[in-house]
């Protein structure tokens, strides 16, 4: 396998997904698979919800053109296909949370039974003692599947954010696997990025606002499920290339945001799935940043956290228990900012005003 072949495959995936996306958005408008504006959604017009369907089509295309072995490829496509189909039905008809959670659990069970993919160990997060899960690992795996799907679903609040965060996660996993010699799984991660990039271009309006599309629940479900599937492939077993604690850093922002928001809702006596405007992107936008600026800032923060995980994994210098402690400290800092969102927003606004005053009041230098 050489770089020219890999590059050619990735470009082919990108072009195929782009063409499929333009085709799918036309079909979506005819069948009513569109997002309509309401009091929580600020977009205008009917936006096709075909990002996830197009990404899935791109991955099917990937598995069709590549000639290297990807473990459990057929099983993954079947499981992911079911989730994308249910997600598309939810986008169109608004399926209840209980039905979706039941189907996600069923798919998780199929993954564990037929793919033998489940959490058997959490690594050496308590020092020299490996935390082996035993039968409890099956239940924790179902929770991990549900958590990953919902974590990526909840960050899909502003243009580009879901695509940006998912690309960060797949890039981090892909780099670790590539340098470890796990090229097949690494190419799968890079193929996910190639299939997501066309969606980001249309979602951000780079090719024109009239071509705008949304990912939809089908897309966020697919991305979350794919992330947890690849992490289970690579963090478990005797010769795993990624430590379980590194996975936390790779999906840090979506995971932190989900846990912090659900905890906040439960404390208020609300359903953990009830919508609100307390996510990290809402906090940043209340501080005076635009939607595009919030997207860039959050994606860069996710890339920074993922880089910490990648460097620690690659160097083998920092013990796993230390990485867990550092992650928990980062999480508590994140939770503190979310809990005091208005204070943080006011502080950032004051800093921005001072910077503008200092910039405006500085004397012009002349020769």
UniProtKB/Swiss-Prot annotation:
Q: In which pathway does it act?
A: Bacterial outer membrane biogenesis; LPS O-antigen biosynthesis; Bacterial outer membrane biogenesis; enterobacterial common antigen biosynthesis
Q: Which residues lie on this side of the membrane: Periplasmic?
A: 1-2, 67-68, 127-131, 179-186, 234-241, 315-317
Say yes or no: keyword RNA-binding present. Answer: no
For this record, an example GO cellular component is: membrane
Marked site, Important in orienting the substrate, at 90-91
GO terms for molecular function, please?
A: glycosyltransferase activity; identical protein binding; magnesium ion binding; manganese ion binding; phospho-N-acetylmuramoyl-pentapeptide-transferase activity; phosphotransferase activity, for other substituted phosphate groups; UDP-N-acetylglucosamine-undecaprenyl-phosphate N-acetylglucosaminephosphotransferase activity
Activity regulation per the record? Inhibited by tunicamycin.
Q: Where in the cell is it found?
A: Cell inner membrane
Q: Which cofactor does it need?
A: Mg(2+); Mn(2+)
The membrane topology term of the UniProt record is: Multi-pass membrane protein
Could you list this entry's UniProt keywords, alphabetically sorted: Cell inner membrane, Cell membrane, Glycosyltransferase, Lipopolysaccharide biosynthesis, Magnesium, Manganese, Membrane, Transferase, Transmembrane, Transmembrane helix
Cytoplasmic compartment segments: 24-45, 90-105, 153-157, 208-212, 263-293, 339-367
Enzyme Commission number(s) = 2.7.8.33
Q: Does the keyword Acyltransferase apply?
A: no
What residues does the record give for site: Could be required for catalysis? 156, 159
Main location group:
membrane
HAMAP family listed in its UniProt record: WecA_Gammaproteo
Q: What does this protein do?
A: Catalyzes the transfer of the GlcNAc-1-phosphate moiety from UDP-GlcNAc onto the carrier lipid undecaprenyl phosphate (C55-P), yielding GlcNAc-pyrophosphoryl-undecaprenyl (GlcNAc-PP-C55). It is the first lipid-linked intermediate involved in enterobacterial common antigen (ECA) synthesis, and an acceptor for the addition of subsequent sugars to complete the biosynthesis of O-antigen lipopolysaccharide (LPS) in many E.coli O types. The apparent affinity of WecA for the polyisoprenyl phosphate substrates increases with the polyisoprenyl chain length.
Q: Which family does it belong to?
A: Belongs to the glycosyltransferase 4 family. WecA subfamily.
Q: What is this protein called?
A: Undecaprenyl-phosphate alpha-N-acetylglucosaminyl 1-phosphate transferase
Organism of origin: Escherichia coli (strain K12)
Gene field: wecA
């Amino acid at each position: 396998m050489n770089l020219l072949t890999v590059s050619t495959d990735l470009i082919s995936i990108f072009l195929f997904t782009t063409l499929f996306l333009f085709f799918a958005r036309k079909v979506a408008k005819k069948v009513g698979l569109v997002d309509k504006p309401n009091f929580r959604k600020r977009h205008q017009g009917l936006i096709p919800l075909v990002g996830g369907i197009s990404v899935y089509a791109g991955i099917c295309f990937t598995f069709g053109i590549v000639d290297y072995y990807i473990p459990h490829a057929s099983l993954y496509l079947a499981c992911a296909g079911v989730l994308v189909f249910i997600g598309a039905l939810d986008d169109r008809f608004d399926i209840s949370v209980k039905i979706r959670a039941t189907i996600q659990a069923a798919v998780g069970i199929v993954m564990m039974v037929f793919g033998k993919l489940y959490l058997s160990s959490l690594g050496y997060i308590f020092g020299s003692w490996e935390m082996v899960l035993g039968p409890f690992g099956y239940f924790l795996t179902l929770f991990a599947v549900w958590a990953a799907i919902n974590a990526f679903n909840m960050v899909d609040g502003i243009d580009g954010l879901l695509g940006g965060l998912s690309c960060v996660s797949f890039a981090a996993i892909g780099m670790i696997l590539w340098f470890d010699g796990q090229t097949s799984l690494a190419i799968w991660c890079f193929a996910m990025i190639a299939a997501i990039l066309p969606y980001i271009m249309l979602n951000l309006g780079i090719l024109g606002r009239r071509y705008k599309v949304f990912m939809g629940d089908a897309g966020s479900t697919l991305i979350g499920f794919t992330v947890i599937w690849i992490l289970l492939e690579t963090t478990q077993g005797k010769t795993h290339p990624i430590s379980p604690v590194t996975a936390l850093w790779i999906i840090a922002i979506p995971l932190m945001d989900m846990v912090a928001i659900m905890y906040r809702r439960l404390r208020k006596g609300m359903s953990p799935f009830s919508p609100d405007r307390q996510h990290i992107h809402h906090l940043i936008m209340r501080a005076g940043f635009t939607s595009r600026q919030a997207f860039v800032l959050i994606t860069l923060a996710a890339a920074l956290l993922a880089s910490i995980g990648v460097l620690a994994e690659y160097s083998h210098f920092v013990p796993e228990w230390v990485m867990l402690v550092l992650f928990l400290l980062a999480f508590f800092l994140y939770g503190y900012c979310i809990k005091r969102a208005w204070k943080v927003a006011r502080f950032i606004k004051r800093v921005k005003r001072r910077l503008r005053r200092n910039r405006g009041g500085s004397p012009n230098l002349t020769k």
